[in-house]
């Protein structure tokens, strides 16, 4: 399941409550074509990797979160462990997304 993040507080809360689990964050926008293309794949990964926390942040709805995470383009995927960013990349690259998850879990 992918959790939709609505605020900076909710983002921080999700990172904190993940504990030892890997957190994968999809920074996207409704008007972004590549974001729409990879969204179903991102959701399917959340079913496949039940021990990983998947979050979705709409950069227009949560501009403060996007700014704090220094998101410059969409989609950007960031990976967190114990509240710390451990990896990130931009672009709708399905293979890289799954490979990065496998590398970090």
From Swiss-Prot:
Residues the record marks as active site: 32, 35
Site residues, Deprotonates C-terminal active site Cys: 26
S-nitrosocysteine modification, residue list: 62, 69, 73
GO molecular function terms noted in the UniProt entry: protein-disulfide reductase activity
Domain spans labelled Thioredoxin: 2-105
Post-translational modification: In the fully reduced protein, both Cys-69 and Cys-73 are nitrosylated in response to nitric oxide (NO). When two disulfide bonds are present in the protein, only Cys-73 is nitrosylated. Cys-73 can serve as donor for nitrosylation of target proteins.
Family the UniProt entry places it in: Belongs to the thioredoxin family.
Subunit-structure text: Homodimer; disulfide-linked. Interacts with TXNIP through the redox-active site. Interacts with MAP3K5 and CASP3. Interacts with APEX1; the interaction stimulates the FOS/JUN AP-1 DNA-binding activity in a redox-dependent manner.
Record's protein name: Thioredoxin
Organism encoding this protein: Ovis aries (Sheep)
Source lineage: Eukaryota, Metazoa, Chordata, Craniata, Vertebrata
């Amino acid at each position: 399941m992918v959790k939709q993040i609505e605020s900076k507080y909710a983002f921080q809360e999700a990172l904190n409550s993940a504990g030892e689990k890997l957190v994968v964050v999809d920074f996207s926008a409704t008007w972004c074509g590549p974001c729409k293309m990879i969204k179903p794949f991102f959701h399917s990964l959340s079913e496949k990797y039940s021990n990983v926390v998947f979050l979705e942040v709409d950069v227009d709805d949560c501009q403060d979160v996007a700014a704090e995470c220094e998101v410059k383009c969409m989609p950007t995927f960031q990976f967190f462990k114990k509240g710390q960013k451990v990896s990130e990349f931009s672009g709708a690259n399905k293979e890289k997304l799954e490979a990065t998850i496998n590398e970090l879990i």
